[in-house]
Amino acid sequence: MNASVVVFPGSNCDRDVLHALGTIAGIPATPVWHKETVLPEGTELVVLPGGFSYGDYLRCGAMAARSPIIRAVREHALQGRLVLGICNGFQVLTEAGLLPGALLSNSTLEFICSPCLLRVERTDTPFTNAYREGALVQFPIAHHEGLFFLPEKELQELEENRQVVFRYASADGSAGIRQSPNGSLNGIAGIVNRHGNVLGLMPHPERASERILGGTDGLRMWNSIKSWLEGGSK
Amino acid sequence: MDFQKAGLRSHEYEIILRELGREPNETELRIFGVMWSEHCSYKSSRPLLKLFPKEGERVLKGVGENAGVVDAGNGWGLAFKVESHNHPSAVEPYQGAATGVGGIIRDILAMGARPIASLDGLFFGNPDSAKTCRLSNGIVKGVGGYGNCVGVPTIGGKTLYDERYEDNPLLNAFCIGLVASGSIVSSQTAEPGNWVVLLGSKTGRDGIGGAAFASVELGEDTKASRPQVQIGDPFVEKLLIEACLEALENGLVTTMQDMGAAGITSSASEIAAKSGVGMILDLDRVPLREEDMVAWEIALSESQERMLLIVRPENLEAVLALGKKWDLDCAVIGETIEGNRFILRKGGEVFADLPASLIGGGCPEISWPAERPRDLDQRQSFDFPTTGFSEDLSRPLLSLIASPSLKEKAWITRQYDSMVQVNTVQGPGAPVSILRIKENGNLVAISMEALPWICSLDPYRGGYETMARSLRPLWVSGAKHLGMTNCLNFPSPENPEQFWEFSEAVKGLADCCRDLSCPVVSGNVSLYNETAGRSIPPTPLVCSVGIIEASCSPLLPGNWKKGDFLFLVGMENASIPGSHFQKFFLKHLSGRPLPPSPQMEADFMERAVMTAAKKLADSAIPLLGGGLAIALGKESIASGIGARISLEFPTHPVAVFFAEGGARALYAVPARNVPEFTRTWKGFPIRQIGLVGGDALCLPQSDPIPLQILANAWKGA
């Protein structure tokens, strides 16, 4: 069970994810430089971490989506293996065409760093099988471009295909655009591809993986991945 | 060009003539003009800075390096420093603030440390003016824009409004980094026969003469100064951090230096002088952003995101490869030689040939005359008009907690990534910010404090109280202090009354540091913060750093539990002069703040640290701005529960609840711990003042304040 964490120029959560996977969750993880063309032997999970790849110049994630390593990541995804994009990594996945939609500037037009309540919409994915459906969890967000957008018809398809995994929510469990701090359509915070093996989300599970940092709701994501890779549940 | 136009005084020019034995050429004159400016030479402040105690058991590297380093335990060091970027932020708020953050991060990097957190000190003018709105928005976005991208969390700071900052807003940027004690970089280790390598951005015409610009008063037309402000690129800075740390990890560099004020000249001559080597630089080899730059422009450009590396010949190839890996320009621009000569060449011609030690170390000190301000007695005469205030405390509390300097600052802190690097245990919004060190399990506690109102009434007492007030939050959280860094923001030293205030404030700081054994490990001075005769109040800003050992957990505020007993520790006779209450309600500062009380501070320290270590309290907060009333209000809001307070007062209730100063704190103690808590505080003034519970804050002889109303006032909702 090995994870590879891709490091783009400007990634700044790569070390955080390596810490959460390796030290906290016990999933051996290694950094992979974006100029590499193949993933390390035995990679089962690829994580595209948060940060400001290429300084967010041009468009968030646009240049990183054209990095040499992305070919190998795409190949990995097409084989049905796991890819997780967090924050800037989610933006890269949409730019690479591995996930639908686009992340636009927050409706506040400001950077927002804040803890957020999320409602878990699906528990039958490799990333969320340790959660209870409808559970409220707290992950922080920290981004300027996190407004999830899709044209209406595609958005409807996304919902019909049950591709929404996390939605911004309030304490009473309601979720939607009104609960989303950044104006995301339908309150969407994280989605999977049709096959369910590629997850992108704006909130940071790696920042919610230790009690000393204020919460451990993110731990269940790592545990979900672990048990899925160990063949425990699908 | 004559020496005056270069910004030199005649006495200084005479020294240059004497030392060189000839007249300097134009390039040399410009170099001296910048390097001997106030900003680079500290010529006005050096005599005062000598007052600071710099030694301490846990100081690994002190003043004289880019940043001080203290021992964080188990072979790890913490490098930290605070620096101003006031003038640039007044002219171009976004870039001025952004490059302030970038500059201090490189100072920390230059010590070989990975930058792990920032704090920002923000001082703005009239909160309702269009100018303040523009400046504060730009500065906050600049701090966030740079810090967020570069991946260094902004975990706290200080924000204060006063009309005297209207034309001269202050931005003080603090950064702290982690370094293995054995890998600290010193600028004294260059050897002859090494390559001088420039890594990072190309050099352009931005920021030329920035240091000199920061050494005079701001002009009224700030737009005219725009060319002196640098433009930042946090993306390149992030690459630079990773590249430099990778080079250090692989032992590829002998030493390195960040490029800030006075660019290549400053960084290169500093290494040469401190290491006792000479240097020849070929300016033709500097990667340029624009063509036909002349020698002095290249030598003095303050283009951002550049580092100077000194590399042994056998490591050069690996360093160049590293530059390529990180897509950074990386060029050999010269070599180190035996001797003391600092030579700049371009196109085969020598443009400067100076003794390296003269450039950075030759500027004579200036001892400005100091004069006690004529109106000081008048400032210090205090007549507290108690008759103007009813005994009700609720209304003044609701007004004060909604005042610009005390109200919630979420509009600022939400724009900062305070959590990246996953170390933030206590982020913005508390008197102390806390980080964990993954490498050794210890916790670092950091505070930032500045008390311009108290300092303008009595700069000595103000300086002392500023220092003590920066330490108290550390102690209350359970941390033992390791050291402090300071940024001395003052107006022109050429005005004798202003210089007197500067001197007194520094003496106050220094005496407190000595009394409490807190070494000063780094710092920065920013003078000439005035525009057209309008001066900022004396604003010495202090950041203190302490450590909580791995086995202990921090005692934090915002955690009142139902049934907790509230204790006020410390004297009740604090002071209204210089307080938020006086500034906000009386509009006029007057009177004398409290005199220092070293024994009280030491006694407080010992007991506070013990209280945290024994986990005797659920929640604790030192009394800071707004005194007891604001501490109660904030604790109540943050904990989401009310309290009933009963307290007899010998004087007017307002004086008890809103006075400031002195070693005081508010503790919430569960019933089972009350006996041990009181034993711990034996020998120190302590008084039980209330009980936690209910959904309102009930102050004596006052209407209860429902929590929701209190929180809305604070949040400005």
Regions found by a protein language model. Name each.
Chain B
Residues 1-6, 10, 16-29, 167-169, ...:
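Glycine-/charge-enriched secondary-structure boundary and capping motifs
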Residues 30-239, 245-248, 254, 269-273, ...:
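Glycine-rich phosphate/pyrophosphate-binding loop regions near the starts of catalytic domains
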Residues 233, 593-599:
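Catalytic nucleotidyltransferase
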